Curated annotation (Swiss-Prot):
HAMAP family: GlcN6P_deamin (MF_01241)
Protein role: Catalyzes the reversible isomerization-deamination of glucosamine 6-phosphate (GlcN6P) to form fructose 6-phosphate (Fru6P) and ammonium ion.
One Gene Ontology CC term in the entry: cytoplasm
Record-listed E.C. numbers: 3.5.99.6
Protein name: Glucosamine-6-phosphate deaminase
Gene Ontology biological process terms, A to Z: carbohydrate metabolic process; glucosamine catabolic process; N-acetylglucosamine catabolic process; N-acetylneuraminate catabolic process
Signal peptide residue numbers: none
Record InterPro entries: Glc/Gal-6P_isomerase, Glucosamine6P_isomerase, Glucosamine6P_isomerase_CS, NagB/RpiA_transferase-like
Reactions mediated catalytically: alpha-D-glucosamine 6-phosphate + H2O = beta-D-fructose 6-phosphate + NH4(+)
Pfam families assigned: Glucosamine_iso
Keywords tagged on the record: Carbohydrate metabolism, Hydrolase
Pathway: Amino-sugar metabolism; N-acetylneuraminate degradation; D-fructose 6-phosphate from N-acetylneuraminate: step 5/5
């Protein structure tokens, strides 16, 4: 796990975009894993800028969303299908048919979850997965207590997560109680994971998952077992890390040829 401490969101967005651009140069038909929430927005903004100004090409890319609310129609403005479309995919030249989402409106939820797992596998797996992290250490919607080997499934949202997400809705009562989410085992199958965290409110979660024990109480801690994880944090989110000086030193001392 590589921890990179940066001044702010702009620098985080640029560095994550560098990694994605390098991937697309090597592999134009790469498979991206897309997250929602505020954390990946600087990355999407920077990728859209590079597409518009420098022609960064997404025409052969496939993308898989991490999660989707259960019970929201696909066109609902806060469905993750619509959020990802507005915030990213409509701003680049990725084919709409190449952007995949769990089907939160399916009549047969278990079958929809298995179909999503099958689609990821058929695409060759995710090359690079973007993640944020919740204040309780959740990734995707794998809340505390989630199985570290879990696959795509339905999950109930805890009240803290519903409160965190209420800012995207009229009020907390409009936030659904259930989601479909890629499991921790599904996320761990991605070849490269980039997790982004900003702000002091994420500092404890960052410390817990980077430097704490691997345990279901902090779902993101499973990433300690992944062979290629990059953690991009601002100074505020890094403020509780005991080894912050070490992380700064190792990043500053990296060979110029070594990317993320």
């Amino acid at each position: 796990m590589e921890v990179v401490i940066l001044p702010g969101s702009k620098q985080i967005g640029a560095l994550a975009a560098d990694a994605i651009e390098a991937l697309l140069r090597r592999k134009p038909d790469a498979v991206l894993g897309l997250a929602t929430g505020s954390s990946p927005l600087p990355v999407y903004d920077e990728l859209a800028r590079r597409h518009g100004q420098a022609g960064l090409d997404f025409s052969r890319v496939q993308a898989f969303a991490l999660d989707e609310y259960v019970g929201l129609e696909p066109g609902h403005p806060q469905s993750y299908r619509e959020v990802i479309r507005r915030e990213f995919t409509d701003r680049v030249n990725i084919a709409p048919g190449n952007v995949h989402h769990p089907d939160g409106s399916a009549a047969d939820i278990p079958a929809a979850c298995q179909a999503y797992e099958d689609a990821i596998k058929a695409a060759g797996g995710v090359d690079l997965q973007l993640l944020g992290i919740g204040t309780d250490g959740h990734i995707g919607f794998n809340e505390p207590g989630s199985s570290l080997a879990s696959r795509t499934r339905i999950k109930s949202l805890i009240e803290q997560t519903r409160r965190d997400n209420a800012r995207f809705f009229t009020n907390i009562h409009d936030v659904p109680h259930h989601v479909l989410t890629q499991g921790l085992g599904t996320i761990m199958d991605a070849r490269h994971v980039i997790l982004i965290a900003t702000g002091a409110q994420k500092a404890q979660a960052v410390r817990d998952f980077v430097e704490g024990p691997v345990a279901a109480i902090c779902a993101a801690s499973v990433l300690q077992m992944h062979p290629h994880v990059t953690v991009l944090v601002d100074e505020a989110a890094a403020s509780s890390l005991r080894l912050a000086d070490y992380y700064r030193h190792t990043y500053d001392s990296k060979p110029a040829w070594q990317g993320l």
